[in-house]
Amino acid sequence: MSEFLTKVENIRAVLRDKNLDAAVIRRNPNLAWLIAGRVHVPSNIEAACFDLVITHSEVFAVTNAIEAPRLKAEEFPKELEVKVIAWWEGRDPLLPTGSTVGSDQPGAERSDIALEIEQLRQNLSAQEIERYRKVCVDSAVALGEALKNIKATDREIDVAGAITDALWKKDLDVAFMGVAGLERVKKFRHPLPTESVVGNRVVASICARRKGLIASTTRIVTFGALSDSDYQEYLGILGVEAAMLDATVVGKPFSAPIEAAVAAYPAHNFDVHEWHNHHQGGPMGFLPRDWTASLSTTRAIANNQAIAWNPTGKGWKAEDTIITTKSGIEILSNDPSWPSLTIAGRTRPDLLKR
């Protein structure tokens, strides 16, 4: 059975369990997971360019005459039937409605199965993990290639342009990009790039996407002399991250890595409330984050689940994409050409000192 049909059968099991007749899948991350492809046209809106309907006996997509040829040729699995409407028509009339129909998006009196669908896609398949490793390595390498050529006199938007160019050359588009030079790096935790000159430090964070799978990575470049105190602060952030990675154990609650971070910040000479200033990350895969973990999160860490932690403090940040396994975590977004050091037995990115 193909990867696509396996996922369809898993959704049919949800239908049987909840005594439903059909499912209407509408959200971008769930559609991308199902078809292992691109589901958007404009990249900055939630609405996908098609819907999927799954019943106990059939599965079909509903899209318009503009998108159908491309989707059938380049994105859809061969087993998927496609129902095509005129571009001026809406898709809703072809979608089943009522309480015996489940959906990942509210509306038309359908039953809510959003959580069940999210739980299905949190356990990545072997095929998905193989693709994900490639996405993560390619995104980290592209980010590194761009950052190795920037100058202290560049503007943040120049850096963002170089990163975007490097990503697209590796068939990766940008789901998120943050770039901060020295002037802004201690002020803002989500620094959308501006015309500000980067100066002697630049922190670049990306969420890069290919065929729905998203990789999160942060790398930092410094220019000129770096004080020992500054470097110790960076090592401190890596220490916080190490505590979180150690606490990321299949079956444990997502609150465990957050508890580890809360304890690790003051242990590494950060303010005891540093963790209040930014979320610490959470599960991901087909979104930059499915949701952010907190001290009150009781959901368990799943096997083969993608996660990105992102501790920050004093203008420093650590972030990479990992996959959980029953024998420990695997860091996916490694760039073998980037300077590295060993923290808690793991290879972690060093600063690129220019």
Where are these regions (language model features)?
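Active-site neighborhoods and metal-handling regions in enzymes and metal-associated proteins
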Residues: 1-354
